[in-house]
């Protein structure tokens, strides 16, 4: 029985290893890796005249993951096609009880005529359930090829310096959700900082309540158009403390 059990465990470990390193290309395909779910998330693919995208895990352990996504999209130049992302799995947590959200993110992008962002995407709601979301907070490490955030006016409302980076802050509605987007003034391919500092800024300066719950924390890329593109995340980590 011990031999059989060990054999079964080795078989499962081998299968898991292969699964983690196999790219997936379906619209809603996912892979669980460490503390994350990695999503292909081709939610806007119908806005493209042609294209495809595949995503895969390179390595993962606990709160650290390395991954990549490759895509080509044509048509619908003003529309996002997808949001391949690594989503941290956690229970919704009230902002007032969070002391820090340390994160590191090292990435590179290659391809032709890329219009895309590289961004954290986080949601705040009145309860720990994501269905109560009222705010979407995006932190753009890059706005490539003229990509731009949701904005009511097209103008910045502030230019704060947070975690040693100067950001253009925009706001606007997305349905019933208010979106705040911090867009780095220069592309930041090697980020290390405390994501809680963005929430502290919004609480102190934009009237966001610290009684709200952080319900979602994702990091990935939103492509508009481009060809033979690849986002390669060599290092990503995040935790809520």
Curated annotation (Swiss-Prot):
One of its GO terms (cellular component) is extracellular region. Keywords: Carbohydrate metabolism, Cell wall biogenesis/degradation, Glycoprotein, Glycosidase, Hydrolase, Polysaccharide degradation, Secreted, Signal. InterPro entries: ConA-like_dom_sf, GH11/12, GH12. Optimum temperature is between 50 and 60 degrees Celsius. It is found in: Secreted. Its main location: secreted. SUPFAM superfamilies: Concanavalin A-like lectins/glucanases (SSF49899). Optimum pH is 5.0. Its EC number is 3.2.1.151. Belongs to the glycosyl hydrolase 12 (cellulase H) family. This is Xyloglucan-specific endo-beta-1,4-glucanase A.
């Amino acid at each position: 029985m011990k031999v059989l059990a060990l054999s079964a465990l080795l078989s499962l470990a081998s299968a898991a290893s292969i699964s983690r390193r196999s790219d997936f290309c379906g619209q809603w395909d996912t892979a669980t890796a460490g503390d994350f779910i990695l999503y292909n998330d081709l939610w806007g693919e119908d806005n493209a005249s042609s294209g495809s995208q595949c995503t895969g895990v390179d390595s993962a352990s606990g709160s650290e993951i390395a991954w990549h996504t490759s895509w080509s999209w044509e048509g619908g130049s003003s529309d996002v096609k997808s949001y391949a992302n690594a989503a941290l799995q956690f229970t919704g947590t009230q902002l007032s009880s969070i002391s820090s959200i340390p994160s590191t993110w090292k990435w590179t992008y290659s391809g032709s005529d890329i219009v895309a962002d590289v961004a954290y995407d986080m949601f705040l709601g009145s309860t720990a359930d994501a269905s109560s979301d009222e705010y979407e907070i995006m932190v753009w490490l890059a706005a490539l090829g003229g990509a731009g955030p949701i904005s009511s006016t097209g103008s910045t409302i502030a230019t704060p310096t947070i975690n040693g980076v100067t950001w253009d802050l925009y706001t606007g509605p997305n349905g019933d959700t208010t979106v705040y987007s911090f867009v780095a003034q220069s592309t930041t391919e090697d980020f290390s900082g405390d994501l809680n500092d963005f929430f502290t800024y919004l609480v102190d300066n934009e009237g966001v309540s610290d009684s709200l719950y952080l319900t979602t924390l994702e990091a990935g890329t939103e492509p508009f158009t481009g060809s033979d593109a690849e986002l390669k995340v060599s290092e990503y980590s995040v935790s809520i403390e």
